[in-house]
From Swiss-Prot:
Name of the top EC class for this enzyme: transferase
Source species of the chain: Helicobacter acinonychis (strain Sheeba)
UniProt-recorded name of the protein: Bifunctional protein HldE
PROSITE patterns: PFKB_KINASES_1
Binding sites annotated in the UniProt record for ATP: N191, R192, F193, E194
SUPFAM superfamilies listed in its UniProt record: Nucleotidylyl transferase, Ribokinase-like
Length: 463
C-alpha cells in the first residue's frame, strides 16, 4: 500500500439538490424546493478521498477553522481512514465551505464562504514541521493548491525542496499565474485555461502546446510537463516531443473534482509503472468515471478497469510487478493455481494466505498451461476472466499469468517471503521452496472443489 502525503487547501463541499418550478413573489428569481442535502470532502481532502478509493494510505496536511464545520470535516476524514494528524486548527478563519445548488442534475449557482489569508507564523511552522517529520516515510507527495492561503510561495518551495532532497515524487495541482512557485516539482497538472493564463500563450494547436510544455520544463524545471485538455484528454512532453493521450469519457454530467481525480490517479500510477504515458491513460480512465457522476465523485479500481478494456490494474506482467516491488519493504506472500470456476474454497484459502503477510501475489496458470496439466476440456473459464475475478478479491494484491507448467520461474524472480501451497503437498516437494524464505502448507476448506462443481453441473443437466 503506497503512502501519500497530501498538502493543501481543505474545502467542505455542500450540495442542495431539488427542483424549481415557481418564481418567488418577492423578486424575479426561481424558488428551489430542496429534496436532498449532501456533504463531501473537497479540495485537498477530495484528492485524499480519491487516493483512498484507489487503495493508498493517505496523510493529509492543511487547515480548518475552529468551528462546527471543521469538526464535521475532520470526523468525515477519519471515517475514510485518512490520517488527520497534520490537519491544523486555525482560530482566525472559518472552514472553507462551497455550497452548490443542483436543479434537475444541473448546477445553477455556487456560494462560497472562505478566508484566503496566509497562515500565521505558528501555523506555518507547525505545517512545515509535520511535513519534515513525515516526508521520509512517504512514497509520494501531492500539493493541492486552491489559493485559499495554505500553499503560499515560500511554503510551496520549501516542501518541493524537501521532497527533492529525499528523492520523493512530488506533484502539484497549480493555481494562479506565477508558476515559479512550483519550480523543480516532478509534475504539475494545469488545465488548458490555467496554463494559458500563466504563460500568456493561446494553446490553440499542437505547436503552442509543445511550446508551453517546453517552457514548463526549461524555465520552471518541471521534470514531467503536462496539461489536461478536458474532452481532448492529456498532453505531455517526452524527449522534447508532444504526446497526446486522448480522453475516454463518453458522457459528462459534472466536472467537479475531476482535477483531484487526475492528480491522485497520476501519482499512484507513476509510482507503480514509472511510465508517464501509462499514468496518463490510467488518469484519463479515472476522470472518465468521475465526470459521468454528479458531485465530487470517486473512481474505484474496478470502474477504471472496466473502462480500460476489461483489464485490471492488479493484473500485471512479471516485469511490471518486479518494478513495483523493487523498493518494497513489506512481507510478500506468493501462491499459485488454476482457480478455474472460482468458489468459496478458493476465496477462503486466499484470505488465509493474505493474513500471513502484507502483499499477496497469485501466480495464475494460463489456458495453455491448464490444458497440458488437466486435458483439452479445461479450463472452463478463460484466463482473462479468471484473472479478473481474482483481482476483484480484496485479499489479492497482484496476479501474474504464467505459461509454463510450474511457477518456478515466477518464484525464482519474485523471491517471496512466504510461499503458500495446499496441504496436499505435505509429502511432496514444493516447487520453488528454495527461493522463498518460508514455505507454508495450508488446507483448503472441505467440501469445495472445481471438479465437484463440474460433476454437479453434469449430473444436473443429464437428468
Amino acid at each position: 500500500m503506497r503512502k501519500i502525503l497530501v498538502i493543501g487547501d481543505l474545502i467542505a463541499d455542500y450540495y442542495l439538490w431539488g427542483k424549481s418550478e415557481r418564481l418567488s413573489p418577492e423578486a424575479p428569481v426561481p424558488i428551489l424546493e430542496v429534496k436532498k442535502e449532501s456533504k463531501s470532502l473537497g479540495g485537498a481532502a477530495n484528492v485524499a478521498n480519491n487516493l483512498i478509493s484507489l487503495g493508498a494510505q493517505v496523510f493529509l496536511c492543511g487547515v480548518v477553522g475552529d468551528d462546527l464545520e471543521g469538526k464535521h470535516f475532520i470526523n468525515a476524514l477519519k471515517i475514510r481512514e485518512v490520517d488527520t494528524s497534520g490537519v491544523l486548527i486555525d482560530k482566525t478563519r472559518c472552514t472553507t465551505l462551497k455550497t452548490r445548488i443542483i436543479v434537475q442534475n444541473q448546477q445553477i449557482v455556487r456560494v462560497d464562504k472562505e478566508i484566503k489569508d496566509p497562515l500565521n507564523a505558528d501555523l506555518r511552522k507547525n505545517l512545515l514541521d509535520f511535513v519534515a517529520e513525515k516526508i521520509q516515510e512517504m512514497d509520494g507527495i501531492i500539493l493541492s493548491d486552491y489559493n485559499k492561503g495554505v500553499l503560499d510561495f515560500k511554503i510551496t518551495q520549501t516542501i518541493i525542496a524537501l521532497a527533492n532532497k529525499h528523492y520523493k515524487l512530488i506533484l502539484c495541482d497549480p493555481k494562479g499565474k506565477d508558476y515559479s512557485k512550483y519550480s523543480h516539482a516532478s509534475l504539475i497538472t494545469p488545465n488548458r485555461f490555467e496554463l494559458e493564463q500563466a504563460l500568456h500563450l493561446k494553446l490553440d494547436g499542437d505547436a503552442n502546446l509543445l511550446k508551453a510544455l517546453q517552457i514548463l520544463q526549461e524555465t520552471y524545471h518541471i521534470a514531467m510537463p503536462l496539461v489536461t485538455l478536458s474532452e481532448q484528454g492529456i498532453a505531455f512532453l517526452e524527449k522534447n516531443e508532444l504526446i497526446n493521450c486522448p480522453t475516454i469519457a463518453k458522457e459528462v454530467y459534472d466536472v467537479t473534482g475531476a482535477g483531484d481525480t487526475v492528480i491522485a490517479s497520476l501519482t499512484l500510477s507513476l509510482l507503480e509503472s514509472k511510465n508517464l504515458k501509462e499514468a496518463c491513460e490510467f488518469a484519463n480512465a479515472a476522470a472518465a468515471v468521475v465526470v459521468g457522476k454528479m458531485g465530487s465523485a470517486l473512481a474505484s479500481l474496478e470502474e477504471i478497469a472496466l473502462i480500460l478494456n476489461q483489464t485490471h490494474p492488479k493484473i500485471l506482467s512479471l516485469e511490471k510487478l518486479l518494478n513495483i516491488l523493487e523498493y518494497n519493504k513489506q512481507k510478500v506472500v506468493f501462491t499459485n493455481g488454476c482457480f478455474d470456476i472460482l468458489h468459496k474454497g478458493h476465496a477462503s484459502y486466499l484470505q488465509k494466505a493474505k493474513a500471513l503477510g502484507d502483499i499477496l501475489i497469485v501466480g495464475l496458470n494460463s489456458d495453455a498451461s491448464i490444458k497440458r496439466l488437466k486435458g483439452d476440456k479445461r479450463p472452463i473459464v478463460g484466463e482473462k476472466d479468471r484473472a479478473f475475478l481474482l483481482a476483484s478479491l480484496s485479499c489479492v494484491d497482484y496476479i501474474v499469468v504464467f505459461e509454463e507448467d510450474t511457477p518456478i520461474g515466477l518464484i525464482q524472480a519474485l523471491k517471496p517471503d512466504i510461499l503458500v501451497k495446499g496441504a496436499d503437498y505435505l509429502d511432496k516437494e514444493v516447487i520453488g521452496s528454495e527461493f522463498a524464505k518460508e514455505t507454508c502448507l495450508m488446507a483448503f476448506e472441505e467440501g469445495y472443489s472445481t471438479s465437484a462443481i463440474i460433476e454437479k453441473i453434469k449430473r444436473a443437466y443429464n437428468d
